[in-house]
UniProtKB/Swiss-Prot annotation:
One Pfam family cited in the UniProt record for this chain: ALS2CR8
A molecular-function term among this protein's GO annotations: DNA binding
Biased composition (Polar residues): 23-34
Keywords, sorted A to Z: Activator, DNA-binding, Nucleus, Transcription, Transcription regulation
Protein name as annotated: Calcium-responsive transcription factor
GO terms for cellular component: nucleus
Native source organism of the sequence: Bos taurus
The keyword DNA-binding belongs to this UniProt entry's keyword annotation: yes
Domain notes: The N-terminus is necessary for DNA-binding. The C-terminus is necessary for transcriptional activation.
Region entry Disordered, spans: 1-61, 130-150, 517-539
InterPro entries with a match to the protein in the record: CaRF
Main location: nucleus
Amino acid sequence: MEQSVDSLKVNHNDSEESKTDSQHLTYMDSSEPSFGQDGSPRVLPVTTPEEDGSLTSQNIPGPLTQAQILSAEQFHLVDQNGQPVQYELQSLGDSNAQMMIVASPSENGQVLRVIPSPQTGMTQVIIPQGPLVDENSPQDVSEEKPSDRNLPAVRVDALADSNSSYVLHPQASLTLPKKTVTRILEEPLLAPLQPLSSNTPIWACRLRSCEKIGDSYRGYCVSETELESVLTFHKQQTQSVWGTRQSPSPAKPATRLMWKSQYVPYDGIPFVNAGSRAVVMECQYGPRRKGFQLKKIGELENRSCQLYKATCPARIYIKKVQKFPDYRVPTDPKIDRKIIRMEQEKAFNLLKKNLVDAGGVLRWYVQLPTQQAHQYHELETPCLPLSSSSFPISSLEEEEAAIRDENCTLPSRLHPQVAHKIQELVSQGIEQVYAVRKQLRKFVERELFKPDEVPERHNLSFFPTVNDIRNHIHEVQKSLRNGDNICNSEIIPATLQWTTDSGNILRETVTVTLAEGNSQGESVSSKLETNQTRNSLSPEPAQLLSSLSSFQPKIFTHLQGLQLQPRFTSDGSPALISVNNHPSSSPSRLLDSVRSVVMNNNSLLLGQTHCLQTDTPLTPNSSISSTMSNLPGPDQNLVAVDQLVEVEDVEDTETLEGNVHRILLGNVQTIPIQIIDNPPVLSNFGSILKEPIFDCFGGPIKI
């Protein structure tokens, strides 16, 4: 070891020849006569350009002309992560000592200081800990290849190791750790892939190579500090709270080379994943968090079907990768794809051989949602609009804008007809998410659009995601649970009045329902549903009928295919049937009687509902508008007829009292029925069958 008193001096090069505004750590030998005077100190080649914030290696030939007295503002020091280091410059009282740099701890807890050595013949430098590599060896020298960005390296001529510090001798220099060197390279701020609009959020402008994807912005950061800064600024600007849904597991390092992935766009630079999984952060109103909470837990228990809660779909995705810019391939679309494919294979083969020593830079790709991506933050505000029956297909954008403005505070990206189809399916009992999605796809591709006009599958307005379908199912279930009518009044036609023209009653389809009373003398409310006679079902009644069948399936499961067979007397006149109530009738028998009289294969026509009171008896000359004859007794029969077309009066007979009506069942012959007002000769068991009625199998039907 040379016996000379050495010291380190910090000097700043302001000459015009240096175009990188670099700072140099200069070395002076105190044994020389020029020590302490304006001489020509030897320079340790350490430069820190301030443009891109990276440490570069430059061998500076020739001595400096003059040492300058500097202030702290003239220096820019960075640690091994490329982050600025706070420091101070202090002059020591000893004349032999020049400067002392005191640096604060860096981000990873390491300390960088330059101090005078208490020993003679050496200068002690404490640097970030890490293995030092002698780049004079043939293997390391071959690694140094010219590129646009010079690697930060300083040649080593002699190196002696002390316990906790590294000792530099004259004509010696320091080599930075090689693995650390490859990770402190910072890239200049590249232009975005596509021009951003003027209303781009400020936090999105801080991302490198930023691009807009739907309601999110995607870009990358080159350091964890930059990433944290962007995330913090995004949270402040959007006023959102996030929780981590998924974190990378501490698995072994990934070695699979890739050109692009779900989180990393293609830019011609190969990379490997630095983590096993991406970091996924969800909104505080997302799944497994708040969302739409039911006020009463008991309501959940009373429901047999599975309920879904509406949750916010906003997500933040962070993916850490290691890029290899030295193996970049051209991305010009004019170049033949075969040439690009050959270049990619060549780059992969080289990387597989030198993957450990290939270097590279770290990037954190981030996808941040905008405020429009958040939904379902207000617990009491319904966000899914109830669609109307008529939807003009001409202008979809204006239609969706009107829905947003009028019906909800937070927009639903589903098209109104798609949302209405979900309501229809749920009302029919189809509540499985994937079953609903299958029906929606058939509806859009076969009914809503022509085969050559079907939109793309990524159009979420017509092909919603599973999460959107769950949210809409939840809204429909909530409406059904609260007793809201999910069928719009516009679907059901206006009130149809039964009027007579020249004494003739209009031919209409009639369905009469008599509910069972609770006690004697209590008025029983009934429903009378009418519609114009037609050969086939219209879509609206068919929809309502299917909804009723899903709610009360037991009513429609008995005696299918039965048909009334009218019997005639020997003289050809229609037989008379006397009908009375059964005092001992039960709800189950009433339900069975409903199905027993639904005969024909023609579908039941349903229309506008009218409530009928049983207070006023039906007379032969009265119009059937809002009343119906009162059947005696405490219990009423539940009667349903497929096609009741005509009600007329017949002449009174000597043995039967009251009014006799004929009921025409579609194209079949009329069957006269007489309703007797509690004659004294009848027993409590009610009805008197003057002529039996048989079903299509020849069996008698009990009334």
